[in-house]
Swiss-Prot record:
Similarity annotation: Belongs to the serine/threonine dehydratase family.
Protein name: L-threonine dehydratase biosynthetic IlvA
Reactions accelerated catalytically: L-threonine = 2-oxobutanoate + NH4(+)
Pathway in which this enzyme or protein is active: Amino-acid biosynthesis; L-isoleucine biosynthesis; 2-oxobutanoate from L-threonine: step 1/1
Length: 514
C-alpha cells in the first residue's frame, strides 16, 4: 500500500501536486472514462467531453477523497474507527473505503434519509445511526460521538487529503486529453473544484477551470463576493448533492486562488442537462451530477464559444428513480422548449379556438381552465417552442397585440410546482388569506407537526403537496389571516420549516385567490 503523507495546515500548490501523485486512491477507486458527447458536440459546435465519475464503485467521485484521507490514518486511528455525517455520496464513499481498509465506520444520517441511501451505506459495510432532522443535527451528533469515543472525523470536503484525493480526477483528465481548453466542475462544499483546479494549474495552467453552482445553493459565489466564507440563509434541495450552506475554509482558499470563473444555473437547466446526458451517452445522472454540464451549456451561450474542447464532470449518479418524473416535466423549460403563460380570454364560445389560431399552429402542451367568471376566463397554457427565448418573446408580443392580457410564468417556480395542478380552485366568496410555500422533510410526523403548529389556530384555506422523490417535499398552503397576526409569525418560526410568502405571486392571483 502506498503511503499517504499528511499535508501542512495550508499547503501550497506544489505540495498538493505531490499529494495527488502519492494518493493511493486506486486501491479502491477506478480510472473513469472521458467520453465524447457526439450529439451535443454537433449541436453546440464544440467538442463536449464528459468525465464519467458515475462509473465508480459507489457511483460518484466521493470515493476518491474519502479513501485518500482514510488510507493516511495511523494504525491507532484505524483501530478506533472513523465517523462522518452525510445523507448521500460521501457516506457511501466512507463506507466503501472502510470495508477496503478494514476500518470500522459509523455513518450518522438524518432520520429523513431515504431508505435506498441507508441501505446502500449498509451494503458497502458501514454502520448507520439515524439521528436529527437535518444534516446539521446529524453532523453535530457525529462530532459529539467522535470526541466521546475516539472516532476520527472524516469531513466531506474541507480537508487537504480529501481535496488531494479529488484532485486525482484532474490528473486522469489531463492524461486522457492534454488539449482541453476549459474544464467545468460542480461545486457543493468545494472539495472537487479545489482539487481539480489546484492540480490543473500546477501542470497545465493555460486550461481554464470554471466552477458551476446551483443558483439556490451558491455558497462559493457568496464567499467570493464577500471575500470570505459566509452562511447562506437557505439552500435549495433539488440538487441535494451540492446543497451546502457554507463553503469550506480550505476549499475556498484554493478556489479563490486557482479558479478562472464561476457560473450559476437554475433547476430547469439542470433537468435539461440530465436529459442531454441520457440521450447522448445513456447516463442517468443525479441532479448535482449534471450540474457541470448545465453550467457549460450556459457558459457557451453567454460567451459565444465555438470550436473548443470542453470537459465537464458527471460527478454522481445516485438518483432517486421517483425523482425522474419531476426531471421529465421540467427539462423542456430548461431547454427553452416550452413557455408557460397565464392568459385572460373572453368567456364566450369560440374564444379558445380563436386563441389557438392566433398561436399560428404552435403545439399547445398544457391547458388548464375552469369556469369562474361570466365575462373573462383565466387560462394556464403551455406552448411548445422551437426557437427558445426569442420565440417566447414573440408570442408574448403577439398576444398583447391581439388584445390579450398575458403574464409569462415560465420562470415562476410556484406556478411550475403547484399552480398548474390546481387551476380552477377559486373560493366561492372572497377570503382574507395569505399564501406560503414550504419545504417539508419527507419523514413520518412532518405533516402532523405542521397541522399541530399552524392548523390548530388558523384555518387552512388551500393546501397542495406533491412528492418529487427527494428527502424534502414542496407544500403550498394558504391561511385565513387578518392584517396583523404577530402570533402567526411566531408559530412559523417555531415550525422551523423553510417558507416564503407567496401572497402576491401573479399565478396565485390569476388562478387561485379569492
Amino acid at each position: 500500500m502506498a503511503d499517504s503523507q499528511p499535508l501542512s495546515g495550508a499547503p501550497e500548490g506544489a505540495e498538493y501536486l505531490r499529494a495527488v501523485l502519492r494518493a493511493p486512491v486506486y486501491e479502491a477507486a477506478q480510472v473513469t472514462p472521458l467520453q465524447k458527447m457526439e450529439k451535443l458536440s454537433s449541436r453546440l459546435d464544440n467538442v463536449i467531453l464528459v468525465k464519467r465519475e458515475d462509473r465508480q464503485p459507489v457511483h460518484s467521485f466521493k470515493l476518491r477523497g474519502a479513501y485518500a484521507m482514510m488510507a493516511g490514518l495511523t494504525e491507532e486511528q484505524k483501530a478506533h474507527g472513523v465517523i462522518t455525517a452525510s445523507a448521500g455520496n460521501h457516506a457511501q464513499g466512507v463506507a466503501f473505503s472502510s470495508a477496503r481498509l478494514g476500518v470500522k465506520a459509523l455513518i450518522v444520517m438524518p432520520t429523513a434519509t431515504a431508505d435506498i441511501k441507508v441501505d446502500a451505506v449498509r451494503g458497502f459495510g458501514g454502520e448507520v445511526l439515524l439521528h436529527g432532522a437535518n444534516f446539521d443535527e446529524a453532523k453535530a451528533k457525529a462530532i459529539e460521538l467522535s470526541q466521546q469515543q475516539g472516532f476520527t472525523w472524516v469531513p466531506p470536503f474541507d480537508h487537504p487529503m480529501v481535496i488531494a484525493g479529488q484532485g486525482t480526477l484532474a490528473l486522469e483528465l489531463l492524461q486522457q486529453d492534454a488539449h482541453l481548453d476549459r474544464v467545468f466542475v460542480p461545486v457543493g462544499g468545494g472539495g472537487l473544484a479545489a482539487g481539480v483546479a489546484v492540480l490543473i494549474k500546477q501542470l497545465m495552467p493555460q486550461i481554464k477551470v470554471i466552477a458551476v453552482e446551483a443558483e439556490d445553493s451558491a455558497c462559493l459565489k457568496a464567499a467570493l463576493d464577500a471575500g470570505h466564507p459566509v452562511d447562506l440563509p437557505r439552500v435549495g434541495l433539488f440538487a441535494e448533492g451540492v446543497a451546502v450552506k457554507r463553503i469550506g475554509d480550505e476549499t475556498f482558499r484554493l478556489c479563490q486562488e486557482y479558479l478562472d470563473d464561476i457560473i450559476t444555473v437554475d433547476s430547469d437547466a439542470i433537468c435539461a442537462a440530465m436529459k442531454d446526458l441520457f440521450e447522448d451517452v445513456r447516463a442517468v445522472a443525479e441532479p448535482s451530477g449534471a450540474l457541470a454540464l448545465a453550467g457549460m451549456k450556459k457558459y457557451i451561450a453567454l460567451h459565444n464559444i465555438r470550436g473548443e474542447r470542453l470537459a465537464h464532470i458527471l460527478s454522481g449518479a445516485n438518483v432517486n428513480f421517483h425523482g425522474l418524473r419531476y426531471v421529465s416535466e421540467r427539462c423542456e423549460l430548461g431547454e427553452q422548449r416550452e413557455a408557460l403563460l397565464a392568459v385572460t380570454i373572453p368567456e364566450e364560445k369560440g374564444s379558445f379556438l380563436k386563441f389557438c389560431q392566433l398561436l399560428g399552429g404552435r403545439s399547445v402542451t398544457e391547458f388548464n381552465y375552469r369556469f369562474a367568471d361570466a365575462k373573462n376566463a383565466c387560462i394556464f397554457v403551455g406552448v411548445r417552442l422551437s426557437r427558445g427565448l426569442e420565440e417566447r418573446k414573440e408570442i408574448l408580443q403577439m398576444l398583447n397585440d391581439g388584445g390579450y392580457s398575458v403574464v409569462d410564468l415560465s420562470d415562476d417556480e410556484m406556478a411550475k410546482l403547484h399552480v398548474r395542478y390546481m387551476v380552477g380552485g377559486r373560493p366561492s366568496h372572497p377570503l382574507q388569506e395569505r399564501l406560503y410555500s414550504f419545504e417539508f422533510p419527507e419523514s413520518p410526523g412532518a405533516l402532523l407537526r405542521f397541522l399541530n403548529t399552524l392548523g390548530t389556530y388558523w384555518n387552512i384555506s388551500l393546501f397542495h403537496y406533491r412528492s418529487h422523490g427527494t428527502d424534502y417535499g414542496r407544500v403550498l398552503a394558504a391561511f385565513e389571516l387578518g392584517d396583523h397576526e404577530p402570533d402567526f409569525e411566531t408559530r412559523l418560526n417555531e415550525l422551523g420549516y423553510d417558507c416564503h410568502d407567496e401572497t402576491n405571486n401573479p399565478a396565485f392571483r390569476f388562478f387561485l385567490a379569492g
